[in-house]
Regions:
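Extended, low-polarity segments enriched in aliphatic/aromatic residues
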Residues: 1-200
Length: 200
């Protein structure tokens, strides 16, 4: 997109805090900050239709997976370009179903362990870190969510953000619960598993 139709009050503000429940998503594979902004800030009548619908088609849901990822990401880029450096992202990795919150009571049950809260001023780094944490879990823990991500081509969100220069896909995890210690995704998941075992 060269432009995006957003909610009418979006431009009333000069800064933005993006608070996102990280989880799976029916079309996006996963819903992180990119999905939250790209879909959440697009206005309902025009912007969301641009993202979901192939030009000339009446069916709102006919778009191919990767094209959907790219349109959603371009919608996000319009918003973050507007706010510039005055934007911060927070992803909450708790109660992660393969389904979006918008599905309500029809959402699939939660089967992925709670991880915690991640935050960054770099959206790509944040969404990449969340995905990496999911992949670092055991097969039993992440199977359903990874299957949802891969079957919907969800990783295209990350590669397209990088292509558009929307952040850095390399990151450092800093554990604030342990004095700001640097940890890997695998270490973060190990600590999570140890905590879960200690509660049993």
């Amino acid at each position: 997109f060269g432009k995006m139709s957003v909610g009418s009050h979006t431009t009333d503000y000069n800064s933005l805090v993006v608070l996102t429940h990280f989880k799976g998503h029916t079309q996006g594979g996963f819903g992180g900050s990119n999905k939250n902004i790209g879909i959440g800030c697009a206005d309902g009548r025009i912007g969301k239709a641009w993202i979901h619908t192939t030009p000339g088609q009446d069916n709102q849901w006919d778009i191919r997976e990767e094209e959907f990822m790219e349109r959603m990401t371009e919608s996000t880029k319009a918003v973050i370009d507007y706010f510039g450096k005055q934007i911060t992202y927070v992803n909450v990795m708790r109660n992660m179903s393969v389904s979006c919150d918008c599905e309500g009571v029809n959402a699939a049950p939660v089967v992925t362990p709670n991880v915690g809260i991640l935050s960054s001023t770099d959206m790509l780094a944040l969404d990449q870190a969340c995905v990496d944490l999911v992949y670092a879990m055991t097969e039993a823990e992440h199977h359903d969510l990874v299957e949802r991500i891969e079957s919907r081509h969800g990783l295209r969100q990350l590669s397209y953000m990088k292509e558009l220069g929307m952040g850095n896909d390399r990151f450092i995890l800093i554990d604030l619960d342990n004095g700001g210690k640097r940890i890997t995704a695998a270490e973060a998941v190990e600590a999570l598993n140890e905590l879960a075992e200690s509660r049993n």
